[in-house]
């Protein structure tokens, strides 16, 4: 596939690197000479210094032969206008725009909704020519809400139906400690699947001989209703979240507060596929008076405090350390980590930290942070989900992007269609986690005798960038604009 990316910042360069690793033809465009030079030194792709919103410049970069365009500049309007411009001349190209401004994002979402209502779900053209619109803050807030739903005991990967993958730390007291997977399978009450293991900084797909050690992070596939039991197996406990303190009055914090307001819950929880909130008590703390005022105007019923969250007087007066959960969601990612670690030392039960990317996960773990929300990884995963073809529904990276968990529809051209899993001799380095054949009403964890039919949906884990595995399941990518 040929993909043109406009914007050679950190996210644009990270996306280009991931796409090049899959063998795609990537063209990265930016009008900043220094960013172009830096990207050109680091990436094995075409990097061009040009005005990305100029159609002539894009055509010189090979726009007419492109499959997709991704706009990641720092200017939301440029990102949106560029997509509209390209759509007018090349409607077949899939266009993805990052829009950071929440108001811009919501207005576009609303226009798209009205177009669908007026013309039906099969409307010929997307609003503003944008096939897929993403807002990093909305994606991050959604991840925070998912973590809150299950007590912030670990991170959770949303996959098929009633299932999820819980990424949990194995405690010293865990029933899984120092046991092989084949022995874990015989434990009373164990009806789950360990999909991957992160041990000593390395992520592996386990086999029956793999030994689970205290301190390991394990990805456990289970029904959502069984999460409290899964937590017990790893030595953790399911803890209700009632009182929440949020550090930072930035966009992600505002969206998190909005999701907890009774008048907004129907919208937010239908948008993100969550259950309704449990009536949590929220307090937001920020040192910036203007941000506090803005948030207070938006949510008059919320408790907004101006101050330093590490100030002993504030901690004592507001009894901050007795909260159930502290969410560090400011725009300063390094301070989020340090604040989370400090609050954990002061006795806060659970902490969530918003970070720049998954490179900080290992450090966060050593600092005692329960859950990290890596902003750039979330954005990359969302974009990659859209660039794998219409049969690929979602992509979640794990283990510093070593592996990916992919949800897809089995194409009639797929090599696995109509075959039993035990007859698939080319699954090395991958694992089928869930399957749902066309006649099935629910997802199931398959076994060797399970046949995967054409039109089925499947969730599998494979090495990142292994396009052969993706095509084996989903067939050759076909983009749909």
What are these regions (language model features)?
Residues 1-481:
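Cytosolic regulatory regions of ion transport systems
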């Amino acid at each position: 596939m040929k993909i043109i990316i406009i914007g050679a910042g950190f996210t644009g360069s990270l996306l280009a690197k991931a796409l090049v690793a899959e063998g795609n033809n990537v063209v990265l465009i930016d009008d900043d000479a220094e960013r172009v030079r830096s990207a050109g030194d680091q990436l094995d792709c075409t990097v061009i210094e040009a005005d990305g919103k100029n159609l002539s410049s894009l055509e010189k970069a090979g726009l007419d032969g492109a499959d997709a365009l991704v706009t990641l500049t720092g200017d939301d309007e440029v990102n949106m206008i560029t997509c509209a411009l390209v759509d007018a001349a090349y409607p077949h190209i899939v266009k993805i725009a990052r829009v950071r401004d929440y108001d811009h994002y919501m207005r576009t979402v609303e226009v798209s909704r009205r177009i669908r209502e007026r013309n039906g779900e099969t409307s010929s053209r997307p609003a503003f020519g944008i096939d897929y619109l993403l807002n990093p803050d909305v994606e991050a807030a959604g991840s925070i809400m998912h973590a809150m739903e299950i007590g912030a005991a670990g991170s959770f990967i949303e996959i098929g139906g009633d299932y999820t993958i819980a990424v949990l730390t194995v405690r010293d007291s865990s029933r899984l400690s120092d046991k092989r997977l084949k022995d874990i399978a015989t434990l009373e009450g164990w009806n789950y699947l360990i999909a991957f293991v992160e041990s000593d900084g390395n992520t592996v797909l386990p086999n029956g001989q793999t030994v689970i050690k205290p301190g390991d992070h394990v990805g456990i596939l289970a029904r959502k209703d069984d999460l409290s039991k899964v937590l017990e197996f790893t030595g953790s406990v399911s803890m209700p979240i009632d009182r929440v303190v949020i550090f930072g009055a930035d966009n992600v914090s505002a969206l998190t507060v909005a999701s907890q307001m009774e008048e907004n819950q129907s919208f937010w929880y239908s948008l993100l596929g969550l259950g309704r909130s449990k009536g949590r008590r929220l307090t937001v703390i920020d040192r910036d008076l203007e941000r506090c005022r803005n948030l207070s105007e938006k949510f008059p019923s919320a408790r907004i405090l101006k101050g330093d969250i590490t100030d002993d007087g504030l901690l004592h007066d507001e009894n901050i350390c007795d909260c159930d959960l502290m969410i560090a969601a400011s725009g300063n990612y390094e301070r989020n980590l340090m604040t989370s670690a400090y609050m954990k030392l002061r006795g806060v039960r659970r902490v969530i930290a918003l970070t720049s990317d998954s490179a900080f996960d290992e450090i966060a773990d050593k600092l005692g942070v329960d859950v990290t929300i890596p902003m750039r990884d979330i954005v990359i995963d969302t974009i990659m989900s859209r660039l794998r073809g219409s049969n690929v529904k979602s992509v979640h990276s794990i283990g510093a992007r070593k592996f990916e968990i992919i949800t897809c529809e089995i194409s009639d051209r797929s090599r696995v269609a109509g075959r039993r899993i035990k007859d698939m001799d080319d699954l090395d380095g991958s694992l089928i986690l869930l399957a749902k054949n066309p006649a099935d009403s629910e997802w199931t964890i398959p076994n060797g005798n399970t046949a995967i039919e054409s039109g089925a949906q499947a969730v599998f884990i494979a090495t990142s960038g292994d396009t052969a595995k993706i095509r084996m399941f989903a067939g050759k990518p076909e983009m749909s604009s």
